């Protein structure tokens, strides 16, 4: 069976404010509505070529809406130093679920939509040495947070929230060639944000 096309609309408004010459802020509000959304309904066992498979049943279940806001602040207190931070809030809910044999609609309606975190945060800083023996050397450090995400429609299974930290070093040569190295997940944090499997 071919899925119906997913339909929806989105509204977003935002503003940028220059508090001082070195400090700026951005704020945005959004609302998203989607119809004919697809959702993993259940896992179902199957056998193919004598091999047992655990497949996901995917179907169109109804409507979801998402609303929230994002705030970003950028600060450059001195030359060649830039810092920024941001926070995002998203309230994404499942609405108007269609009846199906794989899940209870009354247990899923109004629940947080799968794989969308409610809270996110990031902070970033970068500095480049402008004079002396280390002129051209740059360093940047960032950290980010993602709230827990649910793996299913009725919010009975989830991935934990986590923090990640990244570090970067760079050096700019006289010929404007930049060399750099980045270390992602600096503290070797174990985390999960998605689960993949066979679909049916």
Which residues make up each language-model segment?
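Conserved C-terminal beta-signal and adjacent last beta-strands/turns
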Residues: 111-200
